[in-house]
């Protein structure tokens, strides 16, 4: 049986399948995804195979979108449990608004020509991400993806720059 490997230059993708498929992350046990279900995945350093990409929509979500989204939620993130590295970085649930998802996925793959287009894409992707808010592990996974992107040394450099500005 043939399967497709999904590649993204962004840290996060959300898939929406219009028919039943399975997804395998890093060669582990395949996870079945029913029609009209969404899967949120961390792509960075992970090998993601899906049984079929026909009738599958993919939204690509950048570091900046994740960062802006966490800021937008305005939650105390210090209380969020740390994502377990050994866990498969995937969350799945039914999609309630496939039409919105379709537009979000299209926008996420097109370079934004204007500022308003950029804002529209951001709002659409926030809507897609917000569907996962009820999932207990969602914020842990988002923060894990963000931490993965910004290495500690970068954080320290940013912090020391801030101190320089103030002193």
Which ranges hold each PLM region?
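N-terminal regulatory/effector-sensing and dimerization cores
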Residues: 1-86
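Solvent-exposed, well-ordered amphipathic alpha-helical segments
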Residues: 19-24, 34-35, 53-57, 62, ...
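Long, highly charged amphipathic alpha-helices
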Residues: 64-68, 102-103, 127, 153
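Alpha-helix boundary/capping residues
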Residues: 73, 107-108, 161
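Aromatic/histidine-rich interaction motifs
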Residues: 75-103
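Short, Lys/Arg-enriched, Trp-marked, Pro/Gly-tolerant hinge/linker segments that flank
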Residues: 85-95, 111-167
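Short amphipathic alpha-helical segments and their helix-coil junctions
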Residues: 101-113
